[in-house]
């Protein structure tokens, strides 16, 4: 209920779509199931795994790579991807995670492949390191780090990390 006492109804879902160049096609949508009582509603992870399995069953090979935010960085989701013939690129941003800390430590020691180049006024550095493991996940994983620097009213910096399931 809203603070006005009026009941609000809404739906939650997970969507799988083709991104990049047009057309942006929605391949499937999975509604998240509400729970009665005091229990929490079904989460995105459960719906996301169910959607992947349904799309695989319906379409066979429907994608090469699934790109997901940091919420999906866990062994059950990665296992679902791999078991359905998919690769994943998943945002790695929680600095408390061991895989993040291990990757940062190795990158600081200049481990892994590193490329550096300029794009306009931006200096871009990319690192790639393989051989990571995650509890409950039998697959070897990679971490890719992207760092961007540029000057504009002082120094600005942006850094991203992704966990990648493909080893190539």
Q: Where are the model-predicted features located?
A:
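An anionic, glycine-rich sequence signature occurring as long contiguous blocks
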Residues: 87-168
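Conserved, well-structured functional cores that handle cations and Mg-NTP chemistry
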Residues: 1-90
